[in-house]
């Protein structure tokens, strides 16, 4: 994992909202040959809640991967309410995780590094579970399964997965 030696993780802050917005676009799974994601999808309030105002709620937590001085990925979690749920919403006290890496930096172990770090931070904060939403065809699904996320249900065509915290991520 060559990139890990040149990479650095830092805490995500309020100032990272533009990065989290960009990473939200990166996180949208598209099969090979699909048209690029339009940034207009960010007009959807249900998607905007993943990054808008990040760092203003006490349960917001995240890490940013920086390689060669450039922010290349982020992994973050937020809690949502039943009246404004995320796509992988389970309960108001279960944070929902988002993760994305800029395309040129994928496949270098950064996703695993960021995800393990965030899982540890959530456990230290006393969170018992974390959820996420993933397209079943996304390569990220294998990472989640390798780190003990389990299929919980469906939201449209996406899987909701959940992981118990307090257990070591392999």
What does each model-found stretch correspond to?
Residues 1-15, 30, 167-170:
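Conserved N-terminal entry element of GNAT/NAT acetyltransferase domains
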Residues 29-30, 38-62, 67:
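Active-site rim helix/loop that mediates acceptor-substrate recognition in acyltransferases
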Residues 57, 66-98:
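Conserved acyl-donor/pantetheine-binding loop and adjacent beta-alpha core of acyl/acetyltransferases
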Residues 96-107, 134:
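A short, internal acetyl-CoA/4′-phosphopantetheine-binding micro-motif in the GNAT/acyltransferase core
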Residues 107-120, 124, 145-146:
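Conserved acetyl-CoA-binding loop-helix of GNAT-fold acetyltransferases
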Residues 111, 115, 137-140, 157-163:
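Short glycine/proline-centered loop/turn elements that form peptide/ligand docking sites
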Residues 122-135:
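Conserved GNAT acetyl-CoA-binding A-motif
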Residues 145-155:
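Conserved acetyl-CoA-binding loop of GNAT-fold acetyltransferases
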């Amino acid at each position: 994992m060559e990139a890990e030696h040149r990479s650095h993780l830092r805490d995500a802050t309020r100032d990272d909202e533009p990065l989290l917005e960009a990473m939200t676009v990166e996180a949208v799974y598209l099969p090979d040959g699909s048209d690029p994601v339009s940034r207009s999808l960010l007009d959807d309030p249900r998607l905007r809640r993943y990054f808008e105002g990040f760092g203003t709620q006490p349960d917001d937590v995240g890490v940013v991967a920086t390689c060669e001085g450039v922010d290349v990925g982020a992994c973050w979690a937020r809690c949502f309410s039943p009246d404004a749920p995320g796509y992988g919403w389970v309960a108001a006290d279960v944070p929902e995780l988002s993760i994305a890496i800029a395309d040129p930096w994928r496949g270098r172990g950064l996703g695993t590094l960021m995800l393990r770090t965030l899982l540890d931070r959530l456990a230290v904060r006393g969170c018992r579970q974390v959820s996420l939403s993933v397209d079943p065809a996304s390569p990220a699904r294998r990472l989640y399964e390798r780190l003990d996320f389990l299929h919980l249900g469906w939201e449209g065509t996406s899987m909701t997965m959940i992981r118990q915290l307090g257990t070591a991520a392999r």
